[in-house]
Regions:
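Accessory terminal regions of nucleic-acid processing enzymes
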Residues: 1-302
């Protein structure tokens, strides 16, 4: 076994850390992250983006996360009698890989010679976490855990303890898949080759990529640049369409909220359409069920 505990851990955001393949980077490498695009991660790892200092709000989120880990760890212990759980994170690396790598696990569970991983995640609620009611772990988080299982060698079923701000905690189980792990490693090797060849991924329409392009060009030098006519026409058309769509969507949200009153969930028969959730301060947010197909409710008389 070529896995070992790392005693001199690289700090997240440091130049050393940026060069490592870590669990948090796996979803972006695979193109399944809901938060960071392939384009954004590539330029971060290539060193093309200036590091951003941790803001007060972000630090507060980190502090909250650390506090939650303590409570979630105790909850996991109650639900897994006979098992021990490490107090704090443990980082591993696999020296069998030809590239720098790390897997930092929130908790190392042990019972005798048995070992398994216990991860802790926070979210406002199950919907924000990504559970559509099926009880399945979102693909990006599942990929992270499979990477952790591969690097640590702890291939027993892992747990993710979800600690929502609203509702009770929930424990998910992630089964190890050697086939998926091999596919992830192959994708990582292809990713590293693109970095070595200075070949970034193509642009996409994610917020992450949009913000990255803005950060890549922070200066204004006064030059004039010629746009492709098709690109220019598409851009101006989309701007006009966006104004109309935004206005229409706002009106429809208003009507849905008005019908809902103080209700939590809006449905058609038994199909969930939208949910009212607590927002910032005293505000209320309306979350749509994006997985609902409008075609399935056409012609239904509610």
């Amino acid at each position: 076994m070529t896995s070992r505990i790392v005693t001199d851990k690289a700090e997240p955001g440091s130049p050393e850390w940026l060069k490592l393949i870590t669990a948090s980077k796996i979803p972006s490498i695979l193109g399944i992250s809901r938060f960071k695009s392939q384009f954004s991660l590539w330029h971060e790892m290539a060193g093309n983006l200036p590091s951003e200092p941790i803001g007060i709000a972000q630090q507060d989120d980190f502090d909250y996360g650390h506090a939650v880990e303590l409570a979630a760890g105790e909850y996991w212990r109650f639900k897994n009698p006979g098992w021990r759980l490490s107090r704090g994170e443990v980082q591993y690396t696999d020296d069998g890989f030809e590239f720098g790598n790390a897997a930092t696990i929130d908790g190392r569970a042990s019972r005798g010679s048995l070992r398994r991983i216990a991860e802790i995640k926070t979210a406002r609620d199950l919907a924000e976490w990504g559970d559509d009611g099926s009880g399945e772990v979102p693909a990006d988080y599942a990929a992270q855990v499979i990477w952790q299982q591969r690097v640590t060698g702890f291939t027993a079923p892992a747990n993710i303890v979800l600690w929502p701000q609203y509702g009770k905690p929930k424990i998910y189980v992630i089964e190890y898949s050697a086939q998926l792990a091999a596919a992830i490693v192959a994708a990582v090797r292809k990713w590293n080759a693109s970095l070595a060849a200075s070949e970034p991924p193509e642009l996409d329409d994610t917020i992450s990529t949009y913000e990255t392009v803005r950060r890549l060009h922070p200066e204004i030098d006064g030059r004039e640049v010629q746009l492709d006519p098709d690109l220019a026409a598409d851009y101006l058309t989309a701007v006009a369409d966006d104004k109309e769509i935004t206005k229409r969507l706002r009106g429809l949200k208003t009507r849905v909220l008005d019908v809902m009153g103080n209700a939590q969930t809006a449905v058609v028969i038994d199909l969930k359409i939208a949910t009212r959730t607590p927002g910032r301060g005293d505000s209320i947010s309306l979350r749509s069920n994006t997985k609902a197909d409008p075609a399935t409710i056409e012609g239904i008389s509610a």
